[in-house]
Regions:
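Glycosyltransferase catalytic domains, chiefly GT-A lineage
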Residues: 1-170
Length: 170
């Protein structure tokens, strides 16, 4: 019997390699053996040593796929106005936006931030019915209760405080 494959995505640079390794390991520890997992790591400036360490995490039902972010990177680096607080964020925060274009073979996937620990079987999240929605996410509660953040998102970013989402797991 062929197992269904669940595609999982991460976006990193070399500085986040050790964090994504922990996240992937936690995913593997809680993985459902009735599924295969394609863990796609989209990266910029990943050392060969760290790439090998990530590949070494593969198991019988977990495949690690490393994809360098190259031609798509010019879309976000050519315009200085596209950068949000670059002292806080790296360009990798934008990589998740390219997943549908770069990986059209997947009808559905999960994106996970590199610093996220998976404490349960992620197939349960994957199997949630999204209805007619394109995206499964939650409202970022920190923006609702924090007036400074809420004002920033409403006035600068143009998103109402009750519509700003947490993009760490999509």
């Amino acid at each position: 019997m062929n197992k269904a494959t669940i595609p999982i995505f991460y976006a990193i640079d070399d500085g986040y390699a050790k964090f994504v390794a922990v996240s992937i390991k936690s995913l593997i520890m809680n993985a459902n053996n009735n599924y295969n997992y394609d863990i796609n790591v989209i990266y910029e400036n990943l050392s060969e040593e760290n790439a090998q360490k990530l590949k070494s995490l593969e198991t019988d039902n977990v495949k690690i796929i490393l994809t360098e972010m190259n031609q798509n990177l010019s879309m976000i680096t050519d315009k200085l106005g596209n950068r949000l607080r670059e002292y806080t964020f790296t360009l990798t925060i934008f990589f998740r936006l390219f997943i549908p274009v770069m990986f059209p073979k997947y009808d559905k996937c999960i994106y996970v931030d590199a610093d996220t620990v998976i404490s349960d079987d992620i197939s349960r999240l994957y199997n949630e019915d999204l209805g007619d929605n394109y995206l499964g996410c939650i409202v970022d509660k920190s923006t609702i209760d924090n007036e400074i953040l809420a004002s920033y998102f409403e006035e600068v970013v143009g998103i109402p405080r009750d519509k700003y989402i947490n993009s760490g797991v999509l």
